[in-house]
Structures are given as structure tokens and as C-alpha cells.
Regions:
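Conserved radical SAM core fold
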Residues: 74, 81-87, 120-123, 210-224, ...
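Alpha/beta catalytic cores of nucleotide-metabolism and tRNA/nucleoside-modifying enzymes
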Residues: 1-47, 52, 57, 63, ...
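Glycine-rich, positively charged N-terminal anion/phosphate-binding segment
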Residues: 23-45, 56-147
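Intrinsic-disorder-associated, low-complexity terminal segments enriched in Asp/Asn/His/Tyr and depleted
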Residues: 141-144, 152, 161-164, 177, ...
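Alpha/beta enzyme core
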Residues: 131-145, 149, 186-206, 210-220, ...
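Conserved beta-strand positions in the central sheet of alpha/beta enzyme cores
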Residues: 77, 115-117, 207, 251, ...
Length: 441
């Protein structure tokens, strides 16, 4: 379910007077020394740094998440899943058990910690959907990615039963001598997404979306619509928290208000003030209104004031984080406990590596051409491993990867040329041809 509405608005600087003059290197090093708030890492083991990949509809699938994790991202959020689709089994439900798209199923044991985001219009349905997700989490012995299996029963080494896109048998990993680099990469991707998960499989928390600004969502009384109706929003929050076992954290995604009227500001305050008593672990607050969508600057000054008014609440910030420096500017200026990195990490998984480098007292390193190629190959191969069992999987993957290729191109000296070439990609051969031409064979 898209909450980005194919948004293509240009990056804008946040409203944060004096923030541009901050020494982000010193700030990052200080944050690295003190670490993330211990309450967060206690609730979500493995969430060890104050930033994470946001849920991005149409983007944050298993492939994007796994690539981000390989570059230092400590935690990811799925795109928003509709409660009714989860309960009734809509388009794609049989493919993956969850949501509209198979992309939201945990991508194997490496795709953790993972927070699943849900969105809906009726408290009982939202509660039931949350319970269904938790039940999915408890199926620790389930094969989440039954990819290209033969007629044999899945074994403890499912890679032995997998086939590559040409139908050839994929051998054990690591492959024996004689396999091409392409076969090795694909085998690695298949293993990553197909091996049997252990007891940590599933989702580590439930995130309730009360922020989505897309018009069709608002009209159906979902997402950001509820910021205009605090009574309904609180009813949903209470129903989900009551239904979910206490040991599993529930969180919420908000925007700073529905619009800029005093009435809507009071509505936000009423919702936010209820979170602790209901039992929500934290709130991620996007510093734009619902009516703004993604247009115009976000108000970091609002986040700063919110943190000051609620010093005991865990608050994450979102909005206008386009580079690694914005991560640390936001933390320092607003006082939020962690930063949700959204559009700024599309085609830029290195933002997470750079953040860890700065926290360790080092300068952030730009990706080399070779590193760009490796990340793009990994992203494509994992996407193909996940989708190839569906009809026209290679073509669908290639077309889907266009939007990522265009974003990855921003790091390349010939980015404009690459973007033009990416528009027409419709096969794995075409994708790899562009990489060979511009990124080296």
C-alpha cells in the first residue's frame, strides 16, 4: 500500500534555525560514545544505533532492507500493510501470507530486527491483523521463502533444492570451483532469502500507521486521516496494544498534525499524550502535516518542542534527512532518540555505513565505483531470487529496479547518462549491461 504516492518532490531543507552550522563530526562522535538509549536496545535487541530505514511503500522490500543491513542499518520497517488484506487475503496474499505484496515477509534470518507496519480503519480489524502478524512471527520453523523448490521436501539446507533463473540446479553454498561469478552471486542471494529461519523469525514489533498522507488512504479513513479524529485514533491504538502480547513492543507513526489549524494541533496533542498510558514504546513523528504530504520543508523545531514537552517519552524523528549529516543534525537539534531515514536512503545504503563511521570518529566515506556496482548487483540478485517464482519474474524485477538504478546513479560521475539508460531496463541482461559499461565488468 503506497504512502509515498510516487512522490518525486525535490529535497528541501528542514526548518531548523542555525542547524546548518553544527559540527556533525563532533556530534556523531559524542553519540557514538554514549550509544543509543538503553530502553530501545532492551526492547529491540540488535537495534544498536540511533537511525533506521523507514517503511517506504514500493521500495522497502526484503532486497532493499537486506542491502541496507549489509551497510550498517540496525533496524528496518516494512511498508504499511492493510488490516483487511491481512485478514481476508487480498492480492498476493497466497504468495506470501502478508499484505498486498510478498515483499513484506521477513527476508530470512538476516532481515532482523524488523518492525511491521499496519494501517486500517476499524479497531477490531486492526487488532485482529496485529494478532495474525504475531502468529506469523511464532512460526519459527516455517519456510518464508519457498523459492523454486523441486518435488523433494525442504531440507535443513534448502539451497540444495534451488534452481537459478535458467533452471539450472544451484549447488551448496559456497559453490564449488567451476561456478561463474554470476552463479555465485545468485546462489548467495537465494541462500540468504530461502534458508530456514530460527526462533527469531518474524517481526520484532508492531507499528501502527497514523501518518500516511496519500489522498486515497485519507478518504478511506486510514493513516493520516486519524490525526483529524483523535477519538478513533486512540481506539485503534488501544485495540492493537490490548491484542498484542505485552512482550512485543507496539509503536506508532505520526505526522505533526493533520493541518496547521489550532484544532488539529490539539488533536495531535491529545493522541500523543495518550501513548504512554496505553503502552506504546515510542512514536516516530514526521515533521510535516498530512496536508503537506511531501511538499515544503519539515519543521524540526516542532520535534524539538515535542521532545522538551515529553522528556520521558521515546521519540523518533522523520523528515528531510537527505544525507548522513542530517541524521546527526536532527538528533542534536531536536533531541530525538533516533532518526527514521526514508527517501534519503533510496539508492543510498551507504548513508548507514557513513553514520557508523562518523560515530566511530572517522570521516564518512563515499562509495567507490566498485562498491556501487557490488551493492547494485546484490540488490538486483536478491530481488530476482525473491520474485523469480512468479510469472515474468525477471522482467518484473528488472522494471522494478529501474527506480532504484536511477537513485543509485546519483553517486556516479556519469549519473545523468545512467539515469537515461535505466529508464528502459526490462531484463537482467540489460541491467548487467549497464553495470558493465559504467561500473566495470
Amino acid at each position: 500500500m503506497s504512502c509515498q504516492s510516487h512522490n518525486a518532490t525535490a529535497p528541501s531543507p528542514a526548518i531548523a534555525p542555525g542547524c546548518g552550522d553544527l559540527d556533525t563530526s563532533a556530534i556523531a562522535a559524542a553519540i557514538g560514545s554514549r550509544g543509543i538509549d538503553s530502553r530501545i536496545s532492551t526492547l529491540i535487541p540488535g537495534f544498536d544505533a540511533p537511525f533506521f530505514q523507514a517503511g517506504l511503500a514500493g521500495y522497502s522490500d526484503a532486497a532493499m532492507r537486506l542491502v541496507a543491513r549489509r551497510h550498517g542499518c540496525p533496524m528496518c520497517v516494512t511498508e504499511a500493510l492493510l488490516d483487511r488484506t491481512l485478514l481476508a487475503g487480498g492480492r498476493g496474499f497466497d504468495k506470501a501470507d502478508l499484505g498486498d505484496l510478498h515483499d513484506n515477509v521477513p527476508g530470512g534470518p538476516d532481515d532482523h530486527p524488523l518492525c511491521v507496519q499496519i494501517m486500517g480503519s476499524e479497531p477490531r480489524e486492526m487488532a485482529a491483523a496485529a494478532v495474525k502478524l504475531i502468529e506469523q512471527r511464532q512460526r519459527s520453523d516455517r519456510e518464508y521463502r519457498l523459492l523454486a523448490l523441486t518435488n523433494d521436501e525442504p531440507s535443513s539446507r534448502p539451497i540444495q533444492h534451488l534452481r537459478d533463473p535458467g533452471g539450472r540446479q544451484v549447488g551448496p553454498w559456497p559453490p564449488s570451483d567451476g561456478f561463474s561469478d554470476e552463479e555465485r552471486r545468485f546462489a548467495a542471494a537465494m541462500e540468504m532469502t530461502a534458508r530456514r529461519p530460527g526462533g527469531t523469525a518474524g517481526f520484532q514489533c508492531i507499528d501502527v500507521n497514523l501518518a500516511c498522507p496519500v489522498k486515497k488512504i485519507e478518504k478511506k479513513a486510514r493513516g493520516g486521516h486519524w490525526l483529524a479524529e483523535p477519538r478513533g485514533a486512540i481506539a485503534i491504538l488501544e485495540a492493537v496494544r490490548e491484542a498484542v502480547p505485552k512482550e512485543i513492543p507496539c509503536t506508532v507513526k505520526l505526522r505533526r498534525s493533520f493541518d496547521d489549524t489550532p484544532e488539529m494541533a490539539e488533536n495531535f496533542e491529545r493522541i500523543f499524550a495518550s501513548l504512554s498510558s496505553i503502552g506504546y514504546a515510542w512514536a516516530t513523528v514526521h515533521a510535516r502535516t498530512v496536508q503537506q504530504k511531501y511538499i515544503g520543508p519539515s519543521r524540526w523545531d516542532f520535534l524539538r518542542d515535542l521532545v522538551r514537552r515529553y522528556p520521558n517519552n521515546i521519540i523518533f524523528g522523520s523528515g528531510d534527512v537527505w544525507s548522513v549529516h542530517e541524521i546527526f543534525r536532527m538528533i542534536h537539534y531536536t533531541g530525538v532518540h533516533a532518526v527514521s531515514v526514508a527517501r534519503g536512503c533510496i539508492g543510498n545504503p551507504w548513508i548507514f555505513r557513513q553514520a557508523r563511521e562518523m560515530m566511530a570518529g572517522r570521516l564518512p566515506s563515499s562509495p567507490t565505483i566498485a562498491e556501487q556496482r557490488a551493492a547494485m548487483l546484490m540488490h538486483f540478485d536478491i530481488s530476482l531470487a525473491v520474485t523469480r517464482r512468479f510469472r515474468h519474474g525477471e522482467e518484473a524485477t528488472s522494471r522494478m529496479m529501474r527506480k532504484f538504478g536511477i537513485k543509485f546513479a546519483q553517486h556516479h560521475p556519469k549519473g545523468d547518462e545512467i539515469r537515461k539508460r535505466m529508464i528502459d531496463v526490462s531484463s537482467a541482461e540489460a541491467w548487467r549491461g549497464i553495470l558493465d559499461e559504467y561500473y566495470g565488468a
